[in-house]
Amino acid sequence: MQFRIEHDTMGEIKVNDSQYWGAQTQRSLENFKIGTEKMPKELIGAFAKLKRSLAVVNHKLGKLSLEKSQAIIKACDCILKGELCGEFPLAIWQTGSGTQTNMNLNEVIANKATEILGGNFREKKLIHPNDDVNMSQSSNDTFPTAMHIVSVLEITHRLLPSLENLLKTFKEKSQQFKEIVKIGRTHLQDATPLTLGQEFSGYASMLEHSKQQILESLEHLRELAIGGTAVGTGLNAHKELSEKVAEELSQFSGVKFVSAPNKFHALTSHDAIAYAHGAFKALAANLMKIANDIRWLASGPRCGLGELNIPENEPGSSIMPGKVNPTQCEAMTMVAVQVMGNDTAIGIAASQGNFELNVFKPVIIYNFLQSLRLLSDSMESFNIHCASGIEPNREKIDYYLHHSLMLVTALNPHVGYENAAKIAKNAHKKGISLKESALELKLLSAEDFDKFVVPEKMIGPKA
């Protein structure tokens, strides 16, 4: 391996000659050999979009030459095309402002841009990482800006489409199952009837609410910290920079961004991300409930509830032949647990904004993006391999419906609550039907029982 000598304000350091990064990236590699968690590639892409937009705006504001601006833009485009994916090796366990990752971008872009201009960055840098690529910026405003950019883009292009697909499936199932009357359950005990379609409409409504909560959180994430520089005052930045960068980013990405109205808030608080992740946690709670319901309703095949049949995707046991497990449900419930854990980490980290800067930024965005990725992937997997293939087991559904003691609830208006309870308890004690119990207790005639206890008429309010 060949090395070259790079330098920064702390002196010289050896860098692998095949890499584009410079001294500060190398120091971070050597000083923070912690864990395996690296800066997410999605965040690097958001950073490249930001640096690209800044190069455009700094030229328009007369601060950066056209030649340098175009070279930086082309270098950023190389990153966005995936041509430099091996140049961003830093751990998330670094400075809490993300300074080393900001400089990683600056160094790689500067050296690539120098090359684009026909220079040799090993001998002389035609583009400076701080003076040109980082012009009018601080890590303190670029990193939180990149956090918001990647959050908005990933929610828009990844999370919401997956959520929409699963929501569509449950809406379709709700219609498909609307005529199937089944017994309801509360407290894990038998309750009054409803339709399977009504049950699935509840799942669809949960996901619709989660979607709206996430969309609402997006409006806060659109606000960008750029232009605040070191502490929020905008020192060394043009007064029009923040607005113009938001406009340029919006145009380039096709997604709306705006300048944060208060940069002091934008640098020291990550309440927008904590709020958005709160919506992720609420979605995770809904997914946990849905997955648990489905795996319980599909339990069996002979000794469980067995009201639903789910797709058989793979063998379920290494010792029990023929066993098939609700694996998609299990995977999604584990994802939900991870998201809830991430929410705790993000909430604690977001509370640590001391004075003018929060210095827990890398761990916040790492956990945020992990949750987003897991939720997106698990919903897509669950939809394709489980939800879309759910079918009712009519025989089991009808059996439970007509053997439930809670059908006695329909008798409340006719014999009163206490007498209805006597009918149910007597039936349960003697192992007889509700009808037989009512006749034995002489509380109803057979004709009246058949008229009052009709499960199909118990699935909604009466006029």
UniProtKB/Swiss-Prot annotation:
Its main location: cytoplasm. GO terms for cellular component: cytoplasm. PROSITE patterns: FUMARATE_LYASES. The active site is at H187, S317. It is an enzyme of class 4 (lyase). InterPro entries: Fum_hydII, Fumarase/histidase_N, Fumarase_C_C, Fumarate_lyase_CS, Fumarate_lyase_fam, Fumarate_lyase_N, L-Aspartase-like. It comes from the Bacteria. GO terms for biological process: fumarate metabolic process; malate metabolic process; tricarboxylic acid cycle. The record marks E330 as: Important for catalytic activity. Keywords: Cytoplasm, Lyase, Tricarboxylic acid cycle. Substrate binds at residues 97-99, 128-131, 138-140, 186, 318, 323-325. Gene3D superfamilies: Fumarase/aspartase (C-terminal domain) (1.10.40.30), Fumarase/aspartase (Central domain) (1.20.200.10), Fumarase/aspartase (N-terminal domain) (1.10.275.10). It catalyses: (S)-malate = fumarate + H2O. Pathway: Carbohydrate metabolism; tricarboxylic acid cycle; (S)-malate from fumarate: step 1/1. GO terms for molecular function: fumarate hydratase activity. It holds the Pfam family Lyase_1. Homotetramer. PANTHER family: ASPARTATEAMMONIA/ARGININOSUCCINATE/ADENYLOSUCCINATE LYASE, FUMARATE HYDRATASE, MITOCHONDRIAL. There are 2 substrate-binding sites: the catalytic A site, and the non-catalytic B site that may play a role in the transfer of substrate or product between the active site and the solvent. Alternatively, the B site may bind allosteric effectors. Belongs to the class-II fumarase/aspartase family. Fumarase subfamily. Involved in the TCA cycle. Catalyzes the stereospecific interconversion of fumarate to L-malate. This is Fumarate hydratase class II. It comes from Helicobacter pylori (strain ATCC 700392 / 26695) (Campylobacter pylori).
